[in-house]
Amino acid sequence: MAMAMEISLPFVGSSMALSAGKSRNSVSRISRVGFSSVSAVHVPRRMFMQLSGFGSVLTLLDFPSLAAPVPQMKEPEVIRTLKLPSGVRYQEIIEGEGREAHEGDLVELNYVCRRANGYFVHSTVDQFSGESSPVKLILDENDVIEGLKEVLVGMKAGGKRRALIPPSVGYINETLKPIPEEFGPRRSLLSHANEPLVFEIQLLKVL
């Protein structure tokens, strides 16, 4: 014996009551009602289950965001800060894949120098045109400031590091490199020699 279930469905302009019997399904009554009337509709159990499943499919079609899996939030990559015995702190921004620099090597690099508060001091890369004038340094404490040498040793060509260099291993005299050739930038750099300086270094080549 077929089972019938009664549900309430809204219709616009009219309502219909459908009944299911043992041998036939027929429309038993049609009546005109108001615009927002609700009628009881007798629906066979099998039809009800089919309609229910169809409705869930429509829900997913109408709202695809409900069907799509929720993407997992990625944790931001944490850049570690390493501290050397001299007090130099640095971060590995990009790990290079080229030749590794050792003490005594001649290297070519670009750099940006800033004060610890972020104010610009000097750079080998033009801020407007993007053109660069790389410098060549010998990784020796008699040629380059000690703190920068410590940061460069162990770097690989193509790598980039950001370092905070304390004045004790910075420009302890005016002959140490890197130092701008122009008078204005050189004076600006040396005027901040007694404070920590931030260097962002890109190692281009190990010669």
Swiss-Prot record:
Q: Which InterPro entries match?
A: PPIase_dom_sf, PPIase_FKBP_dom
Could you tell me one molecular function GO term of this UniProt entry? peptidyl-prolyl cis-trans isomerase activity
One cellular component (GO) term of this entry: thylakoid lumen
Query: Which Gene Ontology BP terms does the record give?
Result: regulation of protein stability; response to high light intensity; response to water deprivation
Main EC class of this protein? isomerase
Reactions performed catalytically: [protein]-peptidylproline (omega=180) = [protein]-peptidylproline (omega=0)
Q: What is its main location?
A: plastid
Going by the entry's taxonomy, the superkingdom of the source organism is recorded as: Eukaryota
Q: Which Gene3D superfamilies match?
A: 3.10.50.40
> EC number(s) for this protein?
5.2.1.8
Keywords assigned:
Chloroplast, Isomerase, Plastid, Rotamase, Thylakoid, Transit peptide
Where in or outside the cell it occurs: the entry states: Plastid, Chloroplast thylakoid lumen
What are the PPIase FKBP-type domain coordinates in residue numbering? 104-207
Q: What does this protein do?
A: PPIases accelerate the folding of proteins. It catalyzes the cis-trans isomerization of proline imidic peptide bonds in oligopeptides.
Which family does the UniProt entry place this protein in?
A: Belongs to the FKBP-type PPIase family.
Please identify the protein, giving its name as recorded: Peptidyl-prolyl cis-trans isomerase FKBP16-1, chloroplastic
The gene it comes from is FKBP16-1
